[in-house]
Amino acid sequence: MAAAPSATAPKHNYTLGTNASQLELYKYLKTVPPIPELRQAVTIKKYEEASVDDTLYPLIDEHQIIMVVGAFFGDEGKGKTVDAVARHPACTCVARVNSGENAGHTVFDDIGRKYVFNLAPSSLLTPNTRNYVSSECVMDPISFMEREIGQFIKSNMPYKDKLFVGNVFVVTPYHKLLDLLGSAPNSSTLKGMSPIHASKVTKRGIRLDHIFNDEGVLRARLAKDMDTYYGLLKVKGLTDKDVVRRCQEENADGVERVPGYVVDFARAENKIDYLVKLYTERVKNNKDFPRRCDVTHELRAALARGEKLLLEGPQSYWLSNAREKFWESTTSADTTAGGLLASAQFNFQRYKVLVINVHKAPGSSRVGIGANPSSFVPQDYYSAQDIKTLEALPKGGCVDFDKIQNFFYTKAFNTESKTFNGIYEPLEYEDATGKYNIGVAMSIASARHHGECGAVTKKPRVCGFFDCVLHFEVNAVQGPYLSISAVDRGDDYDRIGITIAYVYYDVGNKMVDANGRVYKNGDIIKAGDPVPCEMALYHCYPIVKVINGWKGAPIAASKRRPNEPLPKGVCEFIANVEFFTGAKVISIGNGPRGSDIIYLKQ
């Protein structure tokens, strides 16, 4: 563990090894009295495998609108559940209804070709589906054509009768440059999300229809919206050359975070002419651009015909801009289930709605900035050291995942002690490259072993424990159904930890007033208690219940026989998640393929 950053999360001089501040922190945390829930007996049910026809499909049959949404901080592995729902015979329409290309899903077709979708629904490869990008989405049409539609053109895969685009808000090059120039390191995907949503709410900028209509109106709207861009350059004292140089610096490690056409915009002398020409040639007159339609009307008509609709949720509940707890470090759209339904513009009184929450464990993760009480290291640990990709992690360090996880759960967690309070000791793990704080070692090893990097950003994700405190609220708002992906990772663990509470501690003895409650050192926040705002969560540390793993009894699809009884450790893990969150686990992931799902008898 490491000392928490302040509410504004400034950079810290983090170390690889255990430092004096971590030892001082643990000196206090080890005195926290154990909470009764650590020793509370949880009934271990016998969970049995069942077919998709007997589990998921009956749920779909009872509803008209199905939503698959993230339950943590994104990157939960939603695509697999989306694919499973989309294959239901009556599910004919799949839609993205808000947010933009800051989501990422990797899908493989029947012959193993890889496709990466950021804005297009990930069910584009699913037979007999019509896929929609709705009008409340934000789209960079140039990136959309290059990165997403270009995959279909290259592989000669038809898409014109499967994909339809509404009157989306257009993300321009200057929105992406505003994002680059105005964002703190690691705080953004650089996809222009905050700037385009600012244009949206101030009724500036353009929508897709503007590109296909009067050029004079298009030019006028672009010119008005670009005042913000020119204003930022003036305030920061930047020239076009400075902006180009900043773009080149961002791309210097070989990852193209700023596309070439955005850099060309920064170079362009007449930027309005550049944009009009760009959109005329590559959108308006582009025969490969997908068909356009009134998406809301089409989806309502499909529902009226008795067809079922799947709404594919981008990001997640806790990354929703409509949730106060992590508001400063969220995306710019309401990515909760309620937000999706509102963006889809349906009469919610008319239809039965099914929400399937998706979480991931072990190795629950987050990218970007913000609080993350259940993480192995502070959320800004990598960005503070300018680590942008997995390749930039310490060379040769923390590569023995098995040794590290064993040390973590058997040494740092002294579960045999009568005074064990669920807080691990900041011991040091040592390998040939040096000494590492065990939280740092576990974070690096998890990122390496599980390939945890952002689907969009390529940044290492910060891993940690399954957080029952946060999921209790998710379940209360949009539960109870939960699919947990990547559970086969547990095949490599001797034990598994889940967060069942937090303890608040600030080294300066500072208190935080959140919604009228004052949080002070030693305060416990349990699953089911009000979740405080991020100002308090920066100073919260996980109280972890350690449960038995199932190493030696793998559930990975490549090693397990179908319908083989689930190991006791898996059942114990699921039972504890259900007990502390109130969720109902309907499936667990056990491999990389779309079909690698174990459905649980309900």
From Swiss-Prot:
Its EC number is 6.3.4.4. Its cofactor is Mg(2+). It catalyses: IMP + L-aspartate + GTP = N(6)-(1,2-dicarboxyethyl)-AMP + GDP + phosphate + 2 H(+). It is an enzyme of class 6 (ligase). Mg(2+) binds at D75, G104. Its main location: cytoplasm. Keywords: Cytoplasm, GTP-binding, Ligase, Magnesium, Metal-binding, Nucleotide-binding, Purine biosynthesis. Substrate binds at A455, V456, T457, K458, K459, P460, R461. Plays an important role in the salvage pathway for purine nucleotide biosynthesis. Catalyzes the first committed step in the biosynthesis of AMP from IMP. GO terms for molecular function: adenylosuccinate synthase activity; GTP binding; magnesium ion binding. This is Adenylosuccinate synthetase. One of its GO terms (biological process) is IMP metabolic process.
